[in-house]
Amino acid sequence: IRYQDDRPHIRLRIYLHGNGTNSLQEVFSFINIALTLEYIDDYSICPYEREYERYGAGNYNLIEKFFMVDSKLCLDILKLRRNLSNTEFKSLNVYVAIGLLQPFLGKIENQEFIFRQKSNKLDKSEANLIKSELRNNNYFSRCQELKSYKECKDLLKSIINQRTVPYEQLADSLLHMHFNRLFGDLDLEFRYRNYILEVLNATKNGIRIDIN
């Protein structure tokens, strides 16, 4: 997960089995290599506290599995970046985000709150380009290159069936963490929330944009 607060950093969740000795040795070996290559200049190891109040307690194993699979999905998206134009990359991210959240959409009353939360920054011309791109090109086939996309969607269906917190809260938290993995930039996240809402409103108003 990428963050900018304090200073730019990456947070890695590490799961240890048994006494975890071998796994810890691998972690420290990785850290030493990263320090030597100057990929990082510092590190800290902290206890991981599950956020039950945010995601609910009953399905947390599924939530953590989603974290792992969504991380793979974000890496796959970022690998495609160099072969896409800016509009194609933004359109792909909007398509994937809506696809992931489809199971929630019929259950959330206030979509405007979820997707336009805390932001008034909408570039209408960019939003129109994204809508046109999604309407005229087959992003379903492009998403077949993203091996973790379907697995994420299937996991979300199970998570929803076992949820213990409101739909809006769960959708908002999962969307936020998805964009943290992609960008780690709140301003950029809020711009994407606007794009998502623009596409959803367009489909409500009869513009055909297929999201699968």
Predicted segments with their positions:
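An acidic, charge-biased composition feature
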Residues: 1-212
